[in-house]
Amino acid sequence: DYHYFSFEVDWIIIKTDAVFYIIHGDPGENGFLAEILEKNHIPQTGCDNYVSKLTFNKKKFIEFVDNLEIPCAKQILLKKKETIDIERILETIKPPCIVKPNNGGSSIGVSKVNYIDELEKKIKIAFNEDNQVLIETFLEGQEVSVGVIDRNGKRIILPITEIISENELFDYNAKYLGESQEITPANISKQSEELIHKYIAEIYDNIELNGITRSEFIIVNQIPH
C-alpha cells in the first residue's frame, strides 16, 4: 500500500524502516513521496516535502530566490486554461527567450525561441508537459552546475562544472545523449566562483536544503544567475 509504504508477504504485513529514493521528476522530486513518508513517520533521504515542492516549481522557486536578491532571468507564467496572448507576453519578454514547463525536469518540453512567429508553437509544446508554462529571457553566458553534499550538518560544495552544449541550449539530448561537454573545474573567474558559493549558502540557509543537491547557474558578465 503506497499510502503507508507497506506490503504483504505470506499474510504478514511488512513495514518500511527507511526509504532511499532516487526517483527522477514526478513523484520523487516534487514532494509527493516525501509528504507520504512524513505522514507515516518514515525516515527518508533528501529534502522534506515543503522544500521539494518549492524547488520543483520553477516560478515559486524563482520568486523565493529573487527575494534573496540573487539575480534571475525575467519571466512570465502562463496557465493552460488561459488564452495565449502573444502581444501581452511581448510586453514583458521578447525573443530570444526560453519556454519551459513550470513543473518538470530533464529539459523535456524546453525550447529556445528566436523569432516571434515561433512563440505560440513552442508554448503549446511546453503545455503538453504541464498545465503551467514559464517564459524567460534568454541569458547568453557560461552555464555551470554545482553539487552540494550536506553531511552531518557540514556543507560540502563540490567543484563547479562548466557545461558546453552542442545544441542551442542544454536540452534533453545534451544532458542524456552525450551532446555536450562537461569541464571540471569550470573555467570561470574567482569572482563568479565566490558569488556561486555565496548564493548557494543563502539558499541553503533559508530553506534548509539537505542531503545531496545540484544547482545550475548561467554566468553573464561574471555574475551568476
Language-model region placement:
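Short glycine-/acidic-enriched loop or helix-start segments at secondary-structure transitions
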Residues: N30-F32, I108-G109, S145, E216
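Glycine-rich phosphate/pyrophosphate-binding beta-alpha loops
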Residues: G25, S107, I163
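ATP-binding N-terminal substructure of ATP-dependent carboxylate-amine bond-forming enzymes
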Residues: D1-Y50, T55-F56, K60, K79-R88
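Conserved metal-phosphate-binding beta-hairpin within the catalytic cores
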Residues: Y204-H225
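Active-site nucleotide/adenylate-binding loops and adjacent lid/helix of ATP-dependent enzymes
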Residues: V9-I14, S52-Q142, H197
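Phosphate-binding site of ATP-dependent enzymes
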Residues: N114-K198, I218-H225
